[in-house]
Amino acid sequence: MWANLQFCFRSICKIKSRKLRIFVFMANLLLKPTFGNVHGSHEAYDHKSSKLFIELGQRHLASYVVNSKTNQILAYEFFQLNDKLTPSLLNGYIIDKNFSLNAFEGVFFVHNQKEFALVPADFHKNHLDKSILETIHGDLISLQTQSDELPQWEIVNIFGIEKSIYDSILAILPDAKHIHINSIYLKSAFKQLVNMHDQWIKVYFYPSYFNVVVMKDAQLQIMQSFYYETADDVIYFLINLTDQFLLDVTALHMQVSGLIEEEFITFKELKKYFLNVSPEVNPELNFVKGQEPHQPLHYFTPLFLSSQCV
């Protein structure tokens, strides 16, 4: 009997070890580390007084942990995806980091995806969410619908999560909350309205795409994602937006953040076409002393907004 138990235990260990090796191999193929301050599991903090944020982007996967009281950034890492995010890759990442084994004060998934729609709060009906998303984005991918109420703007942001991704999250982190990145942008923008100019554009850069928020006279004009390959693509899309909403390129203020270098061609081209362009550095960034990043601080602005807006 004991021999059988030993055999079973060794067999289970071998299976788990094999699965771990497979995940590490797949992760090395699909996840390209971009920046971060952790290696292996996030262990060096009190989980019960911390919040975990996992951002699922169109071309990236990121996570970070903040102290619930001070909002100090305790751990973070950002990966570019070489292919589409799959449930198995996401689950493997969560398990590898021991996120599912620790009792965080709160766990939040930030969905940085294009499947969303802004609906006036007075006209929002829950039973129509799925139809609205399918009308705008199609029905080729099965989506789990979610919504964020934004009373400051009197709108509701309805968004879709790929059903297989949502189900995998539900199975491993059932108490996690879900929020869309555009809801984060709008909550952040509302806090800044008093100090904003009449016309402004915020541009958040991610791997292979950027998100845009356009404001005019304290009113939201558009929120949209654009895929790009060259600096010319970025200029083309932004000039079109200024024409569409009758913005004055000599008067509007543009703030850029995320994965864009000031010395690279994209930023330099923006400065040619728009007079008032500047990197946006989040003044509330609070890193652990001695763990300040080597990257420019505007890299982190869009990633850490979520902890300040939930």
Predicted regions and their residues:
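Hydrophobic/aromatic-enriched cytosolic interaction surfaces used to assemble or bind macromolecules
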Residues: W2-V310
